Amino acid sequence: MTAAPASPQQMRDRLLQAIDSQSNIRNMVAVLEVISSLERYPITKEALEETRLGKLINDVRKKTKNEELAKRAKRLLRSWQKLIEPVHQNEVALRALAGAAGSANGGAHNCRPEMGVAGAPKSIHDLKNRNDIQRLPGQRLDRLGSRKRRGDQRDLGHPGPPHKVSKGSPDPLVPNASPLPTNGISGSPESLPSPLDGSGHLGPDGSRLEPSDNEKHSTKIPVNAVRPRPSSPGLGKPPVPCLQTKAAQLQQLDRADESPGPPYPRGSSRCSFSPRNSRHEGSFSRHRSSYIPKGQVSSPSPWPQPPDNTQVPSPLPLAQPPTPPVRRQELLPNAESPVHWPEQSEGHPRLTGPACRAGFSPDSSKADSDATSSGGSDSKKKKRYRPRDYTVNLDGQVAEAGVKPVRLKERKLTFDPMTRQIRPLTQKEPVRADSPVPTEQLPRTELEQQEVKASLQSPFEQTNWKELSRNEIIQSYLSRQSSLLSSSGAQTPGAHHFMAEYLKQEESSRQGARQPHVLLPLPTPTDLPGLTREVTQDDLDRIQAQQWPGVNGCEDTQGNWYDWTQCISLDPHGDDGRLNILPYVCLD
């Protein structure tokens, strides 16, 4: 092979030369070279549609007896199938980003960069300082001023990533606790949970109450959670929903058991990063402020409530706050312990609104709620891109919004000759299921008509048993059946016996009914005109006008009259043998 890579069309031509019309391999070396070239070639969907290499490779895979070649071809077809189907393409990107060191912040999630809320650049040193806040309890109070300044920047219209602080601070931002929506149904795994019940519940005295065993078992760690890499170069970018920060928030959850802190009010707004679950969240948000589940009692809230933000949450903004989603905790609040929110310290006067805590202004939440209602088509398109990690509520039922879509064996691809594109066969399956119905009705009507005709005549009358008995296949079958019956010791006569008896009876009845077809014998003549007497005028009139057997013609046994100028066809023996008699007289 040359140094320059061959085009897909050239590789297709080589493959066609190496196989015959039935996809049998004639040149194994050439086929292996084409497979190797295709494994290294970054082929596109358009090239596959133009060359139809997938069909050729699949036909070769089916016909070949070389197991190694079949495995390589199947692996190649799988990679092409993932290229064509977006679902598989998304999963491949997710695996690649999870394994790469420089892209640990999860670029496989479908973020919407056109939304108004954009994350400010975050330095590695800043991130490390925030991790130090979690590790060193003694330094927490020293950094309240810096947190205040960051909160002021967010209120002034400079949205930045909401910082992660420990649970012991007076203003705990707990972005990794996900409460159930107030109607009791688990939310989508892509939603950013509101900071409620992340580390248990608080009693009236501010002390932390341990969550029940039910609540402990209801949490689920994502499958793709990895340990954070603070030195990763990808951390300098605006964060998106990623794997690294999930694990970082898991560590923060474990440390939260040591430092009690008041949670947010229940009505604090929830944020989400992905528009794919806006449909579910939109329906949940309508019931959230008016409906309370059975085990939850609306407790008195002594803290001041910001207007239009605290109790009425915004219905899932499509804009993505920079903080990525982390471990989900589906913990219902403790119904018996009313939550008391202490007065906030003087250092945090601007962080009272939960919309500011979530990282966006109330204006952006209103705009995002409008975008939610108009983004129904986007949510339908993105509905398939669900993550693998799903949440379980307290009853043990899988959350409806987080269920991975069931993909049956419907991803068989086909080539549409009209559009010349490769597409799945899912839309044609119900048509196929319905199509046999009219085809079944047509034979039924024909069969009914045939049955009506057959009922008029007996099947014995329609069957030519004589010809059937002379058939070699029938005779061999009957003899085989008789031999089987005799070998098995059966005393009853076989089918050939009944057939022979029937044919004998039929033959005798036919012979009895059949008569020979001959001429009538002439009586001995006593009156011979011209010999015994003279010819008279009456004799002449009889010859010309009347039938005179033996004189001007003859008669057969069936009553037919023949003159001497006609051919006579007889059956003298009654065995269908014909005796043809030529005319006695030929008149010119």
Curated annotation (Swiss-Prot):
PROSITE patterns: TFIIS_N. The gene is Med26. One of its GO terms (cellular component) is nucleus. PANTHER family: CRSP70, MEDIATOR OF RNA POLYMERASE II TRANSCRIPTION SUBUNIT 26. Residues 179-191 have a biased composition (Polar residues). SMART domains: TFS2N. Component of the Mediator complex, a coactivator involved in the regulated transcription of nearly all RNA polymerase II-dependent genes. Mediator functions as a bridge to convey information from gene-specific regulatory proteins to the basal RNA polymerase II transcription machinery. Mediator is recruited to promoters by direct interactions with regulatory proteins and serves as a scaffold for the assembly of a functional pre-initiation complex with RNA polymerase II and the general transcription factors. Residues 10-87 form the TFIIS N-terminal domain. It is found in: Nucleus. The modification Phosphoserine is found at S435, S458. Component of the Mediator complex, which is composed of MED1, MED4, MED6, MED7, MED8, MED9, MED10, MED11, MED12, MED13, MED13L, MED14, MED15, MED16, MED17, MED18, MED19, MED20, MED21, MED22, MED23, MED24, MED25, MED26, MED27, MED29, MED30, MED31, CCNC, CDK8 and CDC2L6/CDK11. The MED12, MED13, CCNC and CDK8 subunits form a distinct module termed the CDK8 module. Mediator containing the CDK8 module is less active than Mediator lacking this module in supporting transcriptional activation. One of its GO terms (biological process) is positive regulation of transcription initiation by RNA polymerase II. Signal peptide: none annotated. It comes from the Eukaryota. Residues 123-133, 207-218 have a biased composition (Basic and acidic residues). Residues 314-325 have a biased composition (Pro residues). It comes from Mus musculus. Residues 112-393, 412-441 are annotated as: Disordered. GO terms for molecular function: transcription coregulator activity. Keywords: Activator, Nucleus, Phosphoprotein, Transcription, Transcription regulation. Belongs to the Mediator complex subunit 26 family. This is Mediator of RNA polymerase II transcription subunit 26.
